[in-house]
Each structure stands twice: as structure tokens, then as C-alpha cells.
Amino acid sequence: MSRDTAPAPKASRQAPSPKPAAFGEGFVLDCWYFAALGQELKPGKLQRYEILGEPVLLGRTLAGEAYGLRDICPHRAAPLSAGKLTRDDAGHEAVQCPYHGWLFRTDGVCSKIPSLVEEQGMDVERIRVRRFPVSESQGLVFIWMASDPRSDAEPDHAPQIFPGVVGGKPKLIDKMVFDVHVDHAVVGLMDPAHGPYVHAQWWWRSAKSQHAKAKLFAPREAGFAMVRHEPSKNSRAYAILGGEPLTEITFRLPGLRWEHITVGKRQVLSLTCLTPMSETKTRITQIVWSDHPIFGLIAPFFAAGARAFLRQDGDMV
């Protein structure tokens, strides 16, 4: 066959891109999720969480550093969180499996199998449990959920830093589990039209106070914001702050919503974090900080109102 009549080479076929998950299915990966409050992780204590369907051990070393491991021993699938934090022969802090005493450093590498004898010559460091990158700032612990569970790559960006984390410890912390996929919980966070009906309260605003209004939205990194504006005049909750409050509400993937209110030099930050536990359960955490003196007077009433809001949303979703 001559060169001119030779068959053309077949075009190489690329693997098709994975089909995007339908609404209410799957999770957003390769990003940071809120995992826990820093105050929940005590030095030396091991705690079990469920995040994106994964069993996760979150802990804090005796030196104060937070870490995350898959909460399954690769030997007999015992939960590592049922073990204890100890030290291996090299002096490194390590999690001891409660079943056969295998030791795993906080980077996930196995450092000791007590039942082995020296003559066996096994390289135990080839055994690993999945390590989840963890970052802690502003009293919040975030966990990086990678699409490749075998990847050792570090995250390419840090978690969100929030404006308005002022006044020392949070003025309110509330938690609840919604029996829905995170997509439905996120829609509940963004939906502006349900407020007059679901959250009609005498101290907030009544159904009779509805009126037409428009808000300006702008893009933000991995999300968008309702740009800073004067809050609704018909809201008594804003009125008690006095002065001329301004508020900006920001939404960021995969499940963060925060409202930053300024009243002169005073600030209020209301942060809502959605953490998928599984395909059918989502943990919602509400945290409020402020340096406004009014919170010292209304703290019990404010906490009760905020908890009522959260449970009203839970009833709907």
C-alpha cells in the first residue's frame, strides 16, 4: 500500500467527562467544609463525625494541632475514635486502634503493629489510613474533602476568613440536623421569599408588614452577595441595634451563609454552616459574634429567637 493510500490514523478518544450529579444527589468535592468548633476538640480526645458519608476522626494533639483521619482501621475496620491518643516508639503522637493496638500517626501513617516480631521485617509505614487536611482559624475547624481519596496533595487555597468575628467568644451557638440532602438545605438558606410566612414573629416582622423591595446582588469568590444595604424597616430585630445598621449577606459554596451587620463601629456576624453528613442528613450550625453591648442585655431572648428560626426552617425542609 502506497503512502498516499495508507489509512488515516484513528482519532484518539478521550474519556467522557463525568456527568454532573442531579440536584439532591452527590456532593461538591475538592473544597473546604465546616467540620467543628475549635472548642469541641480537646487535646488528646478522639471524636467521630460523619461528613459526606465518610466516617471521620477529628482530634487535637497534645501540642494543640487539629487533625483528621478516616475513622476506620484498615486491619479489621474498628473505629479508631474508640481508641486513644498515645505515643509510638519514636515519640510521635499516634492514635491507637482499640482492637489490636495498631498505631497511626496523625498524618495517617502506621508506625507500629504490636503483634509483629522483628524477624518478619514488615515495613508497617506502607500501611496508611486516609488523612483529611484540616485548617483551624477564628475558632472554626474546616476539613478538605478531596475527590481523590488517595491524593496527598495539599489544598490549593485556605478556608474562608469571615468579617465581624469580634467580641470574644460567640454569643450564640446552635446546631440541628435536617433530614434532607444538602442541596435542599442550601436552597432554604438562599430563599428570600419564605421569611414572611415561615418566620412571621411579633418581634421580627409580621405577615401584614410585607412590601415590595429590591436588593442588589454581586458576585463573590465561589458565590455571591446581597451587597451592603439598609435592612428592612419593618424588622424589629434590627431596630434594637439602634443607629443606622447596614447589612451584607454572602453565600459561598459548598454551604456557607453569613450576614455581616455594622452599626457605626459595632459589628454583628451571623454565620450559618451546612455540613453534609450523608445523602439524607445535613448538619446545620449557627454561630453569632458581636461586640454590640445590647447582646449583654438580650442574650437569652436572642438565643431563643434564633433557635426558633432554625427549627422553623427544619420543619419546612
Where are these regions (language model features)?
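Rieske [2Fe-2S] iron-sulfur-binding domain
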Residues: 2-23, 37-165
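C-terminal catalytic domain of Rieske-type non-heme iron oxygenases
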Residues: 3-5, 65, 77, 149-317
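A short helix->beta-strand "capping" segment at the edge of beta-propeller domains
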Residues: 28-35
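A short, structural micro-pattern
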Residues: 29, 128, 135-137, 268, ...
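Short, low-complexity intrinsically disordered segments
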Residues: 30, 100, 142, 200-202, ...
